[in-house]
């Protein structure tokens, strides 16, 4: 049974509305002031509120404003009872959050119809809210599952650490590193287009495929061949129109050679040197379209020698495509400058980087997954 709250300082109108609505099968409670109405609403949220506009103390529009600002009461349907019928007054009521109006003197059939319509919308809002909570629960479970698939940080013979902060909707970031032999390690990070499970599932598929080395007769030491094989396997026509960017590298700790290839992914950043004044910055990126976008896409390798005490950062675009408080978008160049400034000033750079990005972000949650891999070679 739906519960309806009537707020009116006129006792006769209270009783009139109570009797009429109870005949329709509703449970009706009453309040004589706005303050009392708010307390009753907080104690037991009704499905619908009918509130007089002009009352001593809190007015109906003030009651409406307070109730609608409470997230727990957002689905409560609010009807303002008023003798004011100007457009300006109705606009003022709508701005406060009112859902409907009933003009005095009250016409019974109109009131009953508006209450029925309001309760239908309340039920619909409740159903949508329930579905939203279920979806958020599923996304939270999916987030935990993705986290469980990620590798653990390592300290020897390389020091590899990471930060992974999924967006509220969960995106398509995934990464891994594994030894191909005692001297060579493959490191990669990918970012699937879009959000939600449709983006996450292809990323998990790629992770499992590369981790198990299920692509037979593939030279996993050759990054360009790996990307070409992934492009043949994950054409977006067969993967829900989802494509992904990826950076894939293989490091040999004996020769200190890093061979890499990228597919539409941001450049990885290699920092070498002993102080901020003599830091060498290398942007490691090769030409190549995102995987799955074009069947005939070509990928090429590049390589570099890793100097002593170098650090490599591999990241998704969520690390720098951040909306600031002034509405502007942060940049890759600014992100690189943060990496350089922290390279020699602190030990746990990733913690400082993440805190800086959280403070920089103007929104409650990040719009995209944020993934950063850090590889310290010595």
Pin down the residues of each PLM region:
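Charged docking surfaces used in two-component/phosphorelay signaling
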Residues: 15-23
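Acidic catalytic/metal-coordinating carboxylates
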Residues: 2, 32-36, 47, 59-65
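Active-site-proximal, acidic helix/loop segment immediately C-terminal to a metal-coordinating Asp/Glu
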Residues: 197-220, 306-364
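… and, occasionally, acidic/histidine-rich disordered N-termini of signaling adaptors
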Residues: 129-312, 364-378
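Active-site beta3 strand of CheY-like receiver
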Residues: 44-50
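Receiver (REC) domain active-site loop signature in two-component systems and cognate sites
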Residues: 55, 67, 93
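The feature encodes the CheY-like receiver
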Residues: 14, 56-57, 65, 74, ...
């Amino acid at each position: 049974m739906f519960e309806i709250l009537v707020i009116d300082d006129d006792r006769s109108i209270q009783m009139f509305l109570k009797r009429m609505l109870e005949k329709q099968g509703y449970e009706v409670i009453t309040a004589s002031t706005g303050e009392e109405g708010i307390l009753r609403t907080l104690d037991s949220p009704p499905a619908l509120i009918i509130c007089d506009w002009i009352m001593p103390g809190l007015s109906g529009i003030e009651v409406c404003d307070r109730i609608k600002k409470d997230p727990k009461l957002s689905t409560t349907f609010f009807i303002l009872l008023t003798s004011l019928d100007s457009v300006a007054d109705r606009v003022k009521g709508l701005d406060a959050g009112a859902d409907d109006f009933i003009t005095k003197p009250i016409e019974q059939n109109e009131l009953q119809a508006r209450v029925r319509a309001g309760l239908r919308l309340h039920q619909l809002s409740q159903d949508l809210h329930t579905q939203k909570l279920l979806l958020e629960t599923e996304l939270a479970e999916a987030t935990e599952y993705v986290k469980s698939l990620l590798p653990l940080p390592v300290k020897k013979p390389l020091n590899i650490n990471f930060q992974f902060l999924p967006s509220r909707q969960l995106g398509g970031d995934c990464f891994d590193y594994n030894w191909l032999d005692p001297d060579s390690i493959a490191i990669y990070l990918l970012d699937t287009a879009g959000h939600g499970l449709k983006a996450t599932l292809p990323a998990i598929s790629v992770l499992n495929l590369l981790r198990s080395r299920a692509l037979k007769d593939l030279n996993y030491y050759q990054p360009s061949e790996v990307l070409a094989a992934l492009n043949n396997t994950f054409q977006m026509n067969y993967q829900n129109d989802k494509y992904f960017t990826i950076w894939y590298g293989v490091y040999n700790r004996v020769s200190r050679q890093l061979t890499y290839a990228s597919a539409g992914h941001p450049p990885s950043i290699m920092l070498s040197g002993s102080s901020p004044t003599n830091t060498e910055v290398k942007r490691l990126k090769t030409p190549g379209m995102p995987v799955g976008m074009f069947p005939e896409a070509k990928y090429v390798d590049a390589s570099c020698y890793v100097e002593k005490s170098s650090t490599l950062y591999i990241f998704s675009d969520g690390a720098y495509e951040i909306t600031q408080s002034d509405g502007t978008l942060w940049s890759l160049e600014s992100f690189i400058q943060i990496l350089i400034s922290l390279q020699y000033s602190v030990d746990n750079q990733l913690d400082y980087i993440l805190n800086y990005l959280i403070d920089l972000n103007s929104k409650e949650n990040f719009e995209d997954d944020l993934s950063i891999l850090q590889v310290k070679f010595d």
